[in-house]
Amino acid sequence: MSSSFGTLYKVSTYGESHCKGVGVVIDGCPPGLELSEADIQRQLDRRRPGQNVLTTDRKEADQVMILSGTENGKTLGTPIALHVNNRDQRPGDYGDISDLPRPSHADFTYQMKYGIRASSGGGRASARETIGTVAAGAVAMKVLKKKYGIEIVAWVESVGPIQASGINPDTISREEVDKQISRCPDQITAAEMEKFITELKERGDSTGGIVTCCIRNSPVGLGEPIYEKLEAKLAQAMLAIPASKGFEIGSGFAGSRQLGSEHNDLFIWKDNRLGTSTNNSGGIQGGISNGEPILFRVAFKPTATISLPQETATFTGKTETMQAKGRHDPCVVSRAIPIVESMAALVLLDMAMRQESRKSFF
């Protein structure tokens, strides 16, 4: 099993949904960075369960503890261990379905691959695993902000059939995103989303959605062609998030329907540098950042755990009706916002450190 990500800024996560705790070990964080638990907690609070009526009823404070790697509030350059205790475990919710592979979950594939699996919750496949990446991403964001002034902001673009419009990626802030519990900054659309999700929660069903993310102030030159292009690493990071099913950058699939004369980003002189008049490339050309905002979208499927009865089969082939008792989000996208931001930060910092490492060779 692969639980590590990154080359120079390397993170290794651990823990399952109903074990004693989850966390991450960070290798490669630069020394001398001012870092407190409060710096990390802000992002964890944005992803924790039980925030509002649109999320799971599981109650977790998700209080982070820095176990190593800092002294007197500064990083030492040694491994940083970040840990969060699980406090509201209910493994008993899964006792009567332990022999039933839940539809669209990892139960079947984990059992077939490893011959054993965590019988309660999703184990390593649970979204609890993302606590580690969000914590490590919060550290990465602080480095990126200090070194380059990089800002990473994600928001909910759509929920089920409901689509937001008129959101300016160049100016949107996290404060604007967090004003709505749906994390859609389009106030009118946000109200429609919240109503739709609430109705689904009452029915015991779920829906999916799309998260858009913008990375601003990225320097030119990040990315390692050919096989570690910046968009390729971003895609890998985003598709590693539980429930993610699609990734597109810049014009994405819609760009395939344009002409070259429509799609090409023409170069112009602006802000005392060479830039582009449009951004259909999404801030990346040839697998390397070009200095324009990096804009991408991630699609998330409907939450697999629903309360409605579903006909499925046991591992021995017996047909049974399953009705899940576990707590779940009727739609994951609002809580996916800090996860998407954090995974993007992990990619950006690792690529930035790799680029910086070659600068002073001669």
UniProtKB/Swiss-Prot annotation:
Reduced FMN (FMNH(2)). Coiled coil: none annotated. Keywords: Amino-acid biosynthesis, Aromatic amino acid biosynthesis, FAD, Flavoprotein, FMN, Lyase, NADP. NADP(+) binds at residue 47. GO terms for biological process: amino acid biosynthetic process; aromatic amino acid family biosynthetic process; chorismate biosynthetic process. Pathway: Metabolic intermediate biosynthesis; chorismate biosynthesis; chorismate from D-erythrose 4-phosphate and phosphoenolpyruvate: step 7/7. GO terms for molecular function: chorismate synthase activity; FMN binding. One of its GO terms (cellular component) is cytosol. It catalyses: 5-O-(1-carboxyvinyl)-3-phosphoshikimate = chorismate + phosphate. InterPro entries: Chorismate_synth, Chorismate_synth_AroC_sf, Chorismate_synthase_CS. It comes from the Bacteria. Its cofactor is FMNH2. This reaction introduces a second double bond into the aromatic ring system. Homotetramer. Belongs to the chorismate synthase family. This is Chorismate synthase. It comes from Desulfotalea psychrophila (strain LSv54 / DSM 12343). The lineage of its organism: Bacteria, Pseudomonadati, Thermodesulfobacteriota, Desulfobulbia, Desulfobulbales.
